[in-house]
Amino acid sequence: MAKATGRYNLVPPKKDMEKGVIFSDLCNFLITQTLQGWKVYWAGIEFDVSQKGMALLTRLKTNDFAPAWAMTRNLFPHLFQNPNSVIQSPIWALRVILAAGLQDQLLDHSLVEPLTGALGLISDWLLTTTSTHFNLRTRSVKDQLSLRMLSLIRSNILQFINKLDALHVVNYNGLLSSIEIGTSTHTIIITRTNMGFLVEVQEPDKSAMNSKRPGPVKFSLLHESAFKPFTRVPQSGMQSLIMEFNSLLAI
């Protein structure tokens, strides 16, 4: 008797990659207040964003700090001693990091349209606004973005987070501690510190670094706990202790 089989069926896509990743996930930045800070949902990823370290950032900026923190303040004079620098929220820092992750994919030059155009627009939205929803009006772009493309974006963002986690805390050994991404309108610098990631957005010419006439810069801190669920190798208590001793940074 003839028997129905699925012998030549196409292999189904990996569910773990494409689970819940739809286009609207990229265009919605959902924020929920919690006791410790916020929960943020974007691109099928949930982040727990803490306010840890923000009080210290403010004290360094307002010159209300302990003498032991002087090195931190002097290491980043364009942030803490610049009248044109402005402290932002940790939510802003997360948006900038995600925008940088999208820009990192664009710099790879291996993506094709319409993915490149969509990523550029979404990156600009995250970087330059505080709105929770982005309306991509080009219907054809939405129609051409497959689940595979969307899951690729999510996967690459998680890879970028691991790239940040692999950075060394600022120290005397000259090890790589920052990632810098330049666009035609901004320069993004993300630096690893004891607490997490010091995020800054400057003008393209990095005029904030000009000691005589420092230009504008926005900055904030994203505590490392926001990325811990997504990093490959969790740090042991001893590793964290060694990291702290390797750096005299207050943050």
UniProtKB/Swiss-Prot annotation:
Per its record, how is this protein called by name? Membrane-associated protein VP24
The keyword Membrane appears for this protein:
yes
A Gene Ontology annotation in the biological process aspect, one of them, is:
symbiont-mediated suppression of host innate immune response
Cell compartments where the protein resides: Virion membrane; Host cell membrane; Host endomembrane system
User: Which gene is this protein's source?
Assistant: VP24
Membrane topology of this protein: Peripheral membrane protein
Can you tell me where the transmembrane regions are?
none
Coiled-coil zones: none
Q: What does this protein do?
A: Prevents the establishment of cellular antiviral state by blocking the interferon-alpha/beta (IFN-alpha/beta) and IFN-gamma signaling pathways. Blocks the IFN-induced nuclear accumulation of host phosphorylated STAT1, by interacting with the STAT1-binding region of host importin alpha-1/KPNA1 protein, thereby inhibiting the latter. Without the activity of this protein, activated STAT1 would not enter the nucleus and be unable to activate IFN-induced genes. Plays a role in assembly of viral nucleocapsid and virion budding.
Supply the InterPro entries for this chain: Filo_VP24
Subunit arrangement? Interacts with host importins KPNA1, KPNA5 and KPNA6. Interacts with host STAT1.
Q: Which domain of life is it from?
A: Viruses
Q: Which GO terms describe its cellular component?
A: host cell endomembrane system; host cell plasma membrane; membrane; virion membrane
Q: Name one GO molecular function term.
A: structural molecule activity
Q: Which family does it belong to?
A: Belongs to the filoviridae membrane-associated protein VP24 family.
Primary residence: virion
Keyword annotations for this protein? Answer: Host cell membrane, Host membrane, Host-virus interaction, Inhibition of host innate immune response by virus, Interferon antiviral system evasion, Membrane, Viral immunoevasion, Virion
